């Protein structure tokens, strides 16, 4: 099955992509865990902007023709430097998110990285997320965009994704991902945050 070629985002796309990501993730449990009240929308925007800027520098972000969906990947080589994202985020996070918020962010990053190391070894593609504008959800746009970007992975490496929304696991399993592990991140203001690791085996040559 042929997929429409997605558009790779460039630096001028950053601000609208952050806005789209913020709308799509407004109720995401990981964002709610890190950015619990009284952290406001401006500080959530800062966190998402840092994430996207990191992807622009060390990975690739794609959108569909309508600009209603995003898929974020990190390059396999970047995964050899697990400290880089922490260094970029954690020190300024103390100012932006407060001490409690910065510690929850630290715990989330470290727990997700720990489960990934337990689930696989060696080079792999890391899927950071799929985001769809609320008005476009339920139309299959996220599925089509993710499928198209999976087809663009040029090296025969496995793909890994960390998810915190149990109702979305079937979405990724329908695209070839398999459940690889589960762990608890911690207790947040909204309750316990859990994390699932999903692994898509390397394509056969």
Predicted segment positions?
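Active-site rim helix/loop that mediates acceptor-substrate recognition in acyltransferases
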Residues: 38-60
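Conserved acyl-donor/pantetheine-binding loop and adjacent beta-alpha core of acyl/acetyltransferases
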Residues: 72-131, 137, 186-191
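Helix-loop element at the rim of GNAT/NAT acetyltransferase active sites that forms part
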Residues: 19-38
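Conserved beta-hairpin
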Residues: 53-74
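Conserved GNAT acetyl-CoA-binding A-motif
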Residues: 123-125, 152-164
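A short beta-loop-alpha structural element at the N-terminal edge
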Residues: 5-19, 27
């Amino acid at each position: 099955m042929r997929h429409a070629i997605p558009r790779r985002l460039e630096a001028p796309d950053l601000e609208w992509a952050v806005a789209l990501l913020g709308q799509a993730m407004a109720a995401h449990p990981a964002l709610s865990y890190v950015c619990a009240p009284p952290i406001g929308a401006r500080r959530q925007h800062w966190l998402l902007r840092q994430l996207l800027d990191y992807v622009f520098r060390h990975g690739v972000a794609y959108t569909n023709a309508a600009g209603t969906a995003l898929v974020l990947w990190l390059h396999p080589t970047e995964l050899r430097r697990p400290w880089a994202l922490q260094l970029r985020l954690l020190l300024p996070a103390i100012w932006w998110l407060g001490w409690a918020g910065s510690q929850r962010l630290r715990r989330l990053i470290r727990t997700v990285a720990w489960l990934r190391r337990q689930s696989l070894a060696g080079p792999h593609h890391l899927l950071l997320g799929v985001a769809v504008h609320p008005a476009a959800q339920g139309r299959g746009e996220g599925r089509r965009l993710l499928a198209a970007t999976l087809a663009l992975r040029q090296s025969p490496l496995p793909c890994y994704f960390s998810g915190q929304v149990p109702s979305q696991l079937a979405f990724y399993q329908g695209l070839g991902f398999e459940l690889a592990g589960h762990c608890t991140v911690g207790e947040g203001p909204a309750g316990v945050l859990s994390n699932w690791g999903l692994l898509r085996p390397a394509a056969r040559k």
